[in-house]
Structures are given as structure tokens and as C-alpha cells.
Amino acid sequence: AGGTSGLYAFPRV
């Protein structure tokens, strides 16, 4: 999964 969530952002794995 990936995208933005609240104050966190992460790459799509």
C-alpha cells in the first residue's frame, strides 16, 4: 500500500 495517511507519507510498495 502507499500514499498519505494523517501526518505520515510513505512510498507505494
Swiss-Prot record:
Chloroplast: is it a keyword of this entry?
no
Q: In which tissues is it expressed?
A: Dorsal ganglionic sheath of fused ventral nerve cord.
Main location as per UniProt: secreted
Sequence positions bearing Valine amide = 13
What is a single Pfam family found in this protein's UniProt entry? Periviscerokin
Top-level taxon in the UniProt lineage? Eukaryota
Biological process terms in GO annotation: neuropeptide signaling pathway
**Cellular component GO terms held in the UniProt record:** extracellular region
**Keyword annotations from UniProtKB, A to Z:** Amidation, Neuropeptide, Secreted
Subcellular location(s) of the protein: Secreted
Q: Which InterPro entries match?
A: Periviscerokinin
> What's its job?
Mediates visceral muscle contractile activity (myotropic activity).
> What family is it from?
Belongs to the periviscerokinin family.
This chain's protein is named: Periviscerokinin-1
